[in-house]
Amino acid sequence: MKVSDRRKFEKANFDEFESALNNKNDLVHCPSITLFESIPTEVRSFYEDEKSGLIKVVKFRTGAMDRKRSFEKVVISVMVGKNVKKFLTFVEDEPDFQGGPIPSKYLIPKKINLMVYTLFQVHTLKFNRKDYDTLSLFYLNRGYYNELSFRVLERCHEIASARPNDSSTMRTFTDFVSGAPIVRSLQKSTIRKYGYNLAPYMFLLLHVDELSIFSAYQASLPGEKKVDTERLKRDLCPRKPIEIKYFSQICNDMMNKKDRLGDILHIILRACALNFGAGPRGGAGDEEDRSITNEEPIIPSVDEHGLKVCKLRSPNTPRRLRKTLDAVKALLVSSCACTARDLDIFDDNNGVAMWKWIKILYHEVAQETTLKDSYRITLVPSSDGISLLAFAGPQRNVYVDDTTRRIQLYTDYNKNGSSEPRLKTLDGLTSDYVFYFVTVLRQMQICALGNSYDAFNHDPWMDVVGFEDPNQVTNRDISRIVLYSYMFLNTAKGCLVEYATFRQYMRELPKNAPQKLNFREMRQGLIALGRHCVGSRFETDLYESATSELMANHSVQTGRNIYGVDSFSLTSVSGTTATLLQERASERWIQWLGLESDYHCSFSSTRNAEDVVAGEAASSNHHQKISRVTRKRPREPKSTNDILVAGQKLFGSSFEFRDLHQLRLCYEIYMADTPSVAVQAPPGYGKTELFHLPLIALASKGDVEYVSFLFVPYTVLLANCMIRLGRCGCLNVAPVRNFIEEGYDGVTDLYVGIYDDLASTNFTDRIAAWENIVECTFRTNNVKLGYLIVDEFHNFETEVYRQSQFGGITNLDFDAFEKAIFLSGTAPEAVADAALQRIGLTGLAKKSMDINELKRSEDLSRGLSSYPTRMFNLIKEKSEVPLGHVHKIRKKVESQPEEALKLLLALFESEPESKAIVVASTTNEVEELACSWRKYFRVVWIHGKLGAAEKVSRTKEFVTDGSMQVLIGTKLVTEGIDIKQLMMVIMLDNRLNIIELIQGVGRLRDGGLCYLLSRKNSWAARNRKGELPPIKEGCITEQVREFYGLESKKGKKGQHVGCCGSRTDLSADTVELIERMDRLAEKQATASMSIVALPSSFQESNSSDRYRKYCSSDEDSNTCIHGSANASTNASTNAITTASTNVRTNATTNASTNATTNASTNASTNATTNASTNATTNSSTNATTTASTNVRTSATTTASINVRTSATTTESTNSSTNATTTESTNSSTNATTTESTNSNTSATTTASINVRTSATTTESTNSSTSATTTASINVRTSATTTKSINSSTNATTTESTNSNTNATTTESTNSSTNATTTESTNSSTNATTTESTNSNTSAATTESTNSNTSATTTESTNASAKEDANKDGNAEDNRFHPVTDINKESYKRKGSQMVLLERKKLKAQFPNTSENMNVLQFLGFRSDEIKHLFLYGIDIYFCPEGVFTQYGLCKGCQKMFELCVCWAGQKVSYRRIAWEALAVERMLRNDEEYKEYLEDIEPYHGDPVGYLKYFSVKRREIYSQIQRNYAWYLAITRRRETISVLDSTRGKQGSQVFRMSGRQIKELYFKVWSNLRESKTEVLQYFLNWDEKKCQEEWEAKDDTVVVEALEKGGVFQRLRSMTSAGLQGPQYVKLQFSRHHRQLRSRYELSLGMHLRDQIALGVTPSKVPHWTAFLSMLIGLFYNKTFRQKLEYLLEQISEVWLLPHWLDLANVEVLAADDTRVPLYMLMVAVHKELDSDDVPDGRFDILLCRDSSREVGE
């Protein structure tokens, strides 16, 4: 650095010079403006390095991507060393506040600064402390302004789009040239975005008079007296402010379609949203700034951190925002962008950036342009308001053509030299921009330059008027006149814009920029804005409406007929009247803006006395702090009629209160001054209406707005409350979360939230700042906090596990609310008092308040929090036991879910449109019940582990969707939910306390049934400390009385209310429902129907285990049938035998049959029936008998006879029963035999035989057959007896026997077949018998059997399955519905056969899945090969997202549960084999090929079974390819070959590591780890890309979990996935490698550590600290994914090739290598040495050469 430059540095007092030059960045920030003014600068490009994050200068060798991302800076270059340069760039200091910045009470300064710079884009403006407090109000109330802007813009767009053919719309929204409409079709999200962009400007519009930056604003013309702006503010403050509420009214009118200004207002809002959308760097579509680099530039330059100036975009980029500017507009913008450098409010370096203060001052500027008493409305000028603005010289004036609405230039200068005056009309686009410049930009430019601007001197071409002596006119006066008279000015030079500059823009800028807003649109938009902002009386006041049209420079009739804006009755207004009315309108407009000075409002006399006194007091001492004095509006009177009107709005004209208590309490809440009220009313009483009606009454008050809050304990109740309270549109209801995040929106009447919201710090801060927000933001004190309502407040005391979450409620300012209301149905005095004290209140008053004692409080000055809460106990007052309208039954059952399923089935059979709630004790039980019952009902389930949004969605679905039948959940579903169709509540909880019982029963509003089911021989678990004890055995009513403190009525009438069988207090509908349920229960008992709901181990089952298991008696049997039902059929008899049984008995009989059989009877029967007996039976049955038997028993019976015969008998029988025999058998039952049989059996008898299982016959038969007789018959039936009976049985005897064997006899016989019986039957049927049986069961027989077996019969067969077959089955497979549709059975059974066939094929293809099979076995590898190729560490996370990871399906095969192909006893699932097969494919492919492979198998991403079939087709090819590609790997890992570095020619030539001894390699390895340990470097990141980032937690951790958390916190895994091939696996794959996947390798590594330690001690070397296992694994993983290192290692070490799986890499790294001195070192040490060698400055070039050599060597080899 030169000596002169160094002195300048010292003069600039750049104290941080030395430290800044030592910075690693090439770009150094410098805050000294003097330095940059005195030392020459240059423009250089810089970019941010992705690896290091440093800012570096663009050099010759910089890559193309870095050049593309570069940015330019004006810098000073400094040499800080040999060939080392640093570059200084100017960055100004933070604004300096007087006395230092004071943090806001509710926002930290950092948030304020971020909000100001981000939202308002005012980097160059300086604010004081008061300004920050004002601007912070927008942050606190952003939601209000966002919603307001969005609603207005949405409505405007709706109107404009809906009226395309309207005359006013056509004129307003149609292009003058093309005639095409310009109203774009915008999506709602786009409109919302535009509306949100407009919100900051609307806020500044309302608070512009409160910002200090406008203190420099002076609004006087030259020669007039200057006005004191402080006095102006004091004059404005006492006046009645125009409230923000007016804007809300605009929104409401638009929503109700009362407005007629929507189309006009749309234009101006669209102009704000589209034309002022230019944002800071990084916005959508930003391009590089284009500026003219002159000595004094017209367009000031702005760095990349500021806003872009004068965006010049190409019209050929459709993705850019529509902001293309043509030459004229660019000229207008640039001409007013230059401002003087001496203004305090702007930046000293760059002047002011145009787009910064356009956003701030768009709505705020109002200028006084003529005489003192004549006012001009800025932004709403009349057409002749611009007629005096000169274009270039005094003879070039600007006019507006009233017909075409185009700008006209009047001039007497022509290029031909003539002085003939001409009027030149501009085109529409140019007219738009000129008008925009005159009415908007020039006004803001004047405001920004201020009264001290004096750059212009007096020239002859200037007309100086209004001064007695022109020679005494100062430069300041001249400059003022020029600004108001001429268009194209260069304010920096103090002259007009040169013609060369104008031509330059014409050459550079596009000439075909698309038209945005034409003149008519802009003009009418400005007029519409003026109408809305001046006052609401424009809509109703006749004269002022007419004045608005005069201000637009057309008649009233024109405004009505052409524009369709207002409705008038006058056709004209005289000029004098129009002038007066315009003055009044202008005064209101200017007063509202608060920017003009020295005027006296003509209606100031209308102010009240309070305002005048306040104004005088403020003006007497203008140096004191100005406080806004607002007129305090009295609270509107309340009456009892308000509540009645509210009830009629909500419930209709027939509204009446439930009783007198409800009426009086509702009046107490609405009208009394009691600050805090607690109410205990029974569930279902209507507690919600106690505050709902007062809220509606408050919302109807027009003068005062009340904002109330309701809090409920659970998210489930939140959804229900919002639905109930928002009905009929009486209240605007919103979630509290909206208020916490965005503030009050000005519309909502009631916010609803949960207890967690009430306890949050953000909510507490919002309430604490309420008064300040309302006064400053809404400029009124008439928006008040209404009621704070807490429902079910007893939870504050009873919810022990949540009490720590309620601590934040004590910080809430309860005194800010008008009234606090606490409601509960289960809060006696003791519970209520403790709950209130827990949240910081005083508690209950000593004496609970009676409902009739409506006394006012004597002294409420202490506030709500210090005043005791008055308790209204409606339960004690009525002296009635609650919930008497509900029938409550308590049962002890064997299985709670089984009993609950029976009750629900019975309920929906009798009441199909009803709903039910089931309360479970655990979340696991909830999920199990939902999964099990989904086939019977439409189920919704909820528990606490679900997210808040999901809870709300599911609750809303159950409440609103009539098809949903059952809601299953934990106790959170029992509080506060109101469902009219609810008729049953079932509680499956052994720890139920009295509050939970009352809340659950209370859901039954209009009566119903409540069942409390508990298991037999169970005991209630111990309750936690502080919790209520579980309910006791005995009468429920008595326990409820005791809880509420009511008088006991033991021994009196009314002791049992809805319990213990009492039905006295129940409604008629409830009694009828009970009777129907009882009849269904009796019918089920008579039929002895058993419904198996869940296995006995249901309570202990784990809900997370969703695998489907399939069972059969013999795994190797080819007849393995899906499900326990078919399996049990195979266990006892073949399918055909079961079919014959089903033919003779109906569904009900079979069901009871299977339930009542005992084992010993069947066992003795089977034992006494030997082969000889059966043979005798078959031989002694003559043809006639056989025929008669065939008549009554189908061919199925014959099949059953074959089953019972021994092996020899069966073979002979089967051999003689061929196709011909079957035909002869059928023929022996000829017509004669049939007829004789029929003749012996009368019509009535036949009917009884055919319908032997009908109700009447069965009952009479049952009564005549006793159990004792049946038992004695079974006892006396020996082998001999059976033989004689069979031989003497003729046709007639058979008939009588059949007629005497009633349903009960069949049941007793069948009922004795249990598991033992089935086993004995199977034992007597040997292999030969089974084969012959199978051979005799033809396809035709099976079909006929299927047709004869109804759906119910099959289900009854399923129910009789032996217990052994069920023990491994899934509970869902054993469920059945007793009324299943018969027509669906054929489809189900066909589906079962298809699934059975598929399962058989898969089991045959993968026979070893019952063992620890892997895919390598399937491919045919030997065990020793599998040992080294084994895929440990490969799990489901190896698969990419979406591959074999579908949820809600079977985890074993990824199919629907009904189509699951898994089988019982399967240890290795098909999905596991599929992801192992995917890993095998990865073994054979590099990254690019594997990525393509994943795309090719996309059809199989959700079907692992299908993928296995696809994989199996090429198994031989895959096996050969693995053998070929991994032969070297197997040779090395099996120690058959040894790697020697001396055998690698390329390694010896290209790396010094290959010439090192083993000891040198080890020393280098330990040195690397020592350096890493000292610097606490992140291991995985270092070995991945040599990045030395610190991670102290990784080195201090002692377990894998902490290391993984540290790496995850640092984003290592995320970077690994984004930068390497790890992205081809699941997101958790690499992270899970640190778990127990590699425990075998870990043990080997730990053994090797001991060996290394012994070696070092033996060599006399100080033992080095070797890395622990986690760091070692991180190293290997980092090296595996380091592509550059892998390529070099594979190039240098010729004995190895590529491996693509991490497990193989880990095994390979542990093999031993012979170093140059023939000593053995692990390969991973050699790897680290090579990695270290690569870590040098010339790595990129070296890598490139290595790859070239590698490729060339391969070519030579080939």
Curated annotation (Swiss-Prot):
Q: Where is the stretch described as Disordered? A: 1142-1384
Q: List the protein's name.
A: Y' element ATP-dependent helicase YIL177C
> Which GO BP annotation is one of this protein's?
telomere maintenance via recombination
Keyword Repeat on this protein? yes
Q: Which residues form the Helicase ATP-binding domain?
A: 668-845
Q: Which PROSITE patterns match?
A: HELICASE_ATP_BIND_1, HELICASE_CTER
- So which domain of life are we looking at? Eukaryota
**Cited InterPro entries:** DEAD/DEAH_box_helicase_dom, Helicase_ATP-bd, Helicase_C-like, P-loop_NTPase, Sir1_ORC-binding, Y'_ATP-dependent_helicase
Residue positions annotated to bind ATP are A681, P682, P683, G684, Y685, G686, K687, T688
- Biased composition regions of type Basic and acidic residues, renumbered to the chain: 1361-1384
What PANTHER family does the record point to?
Answer: PTHR31583, PTHR31583:SF2
Task: Tell me which UniProt keywords the record has, alphabetically.
Answer: ATP-binding, Helicase, Hydrolase, Isomerase, Nucleotide-binding, Repeat
Question: What are the EC numbers?
Answer: 5.6.2.-
User: What family does this belong to?
Assistant: Belongs to the helicase family. Yeast subtelomeric Y' repeat subfamily.
Return one GO MF term.
ATP hydrolysis activity
- The enzyme's main class, written as a single word, is isomerase
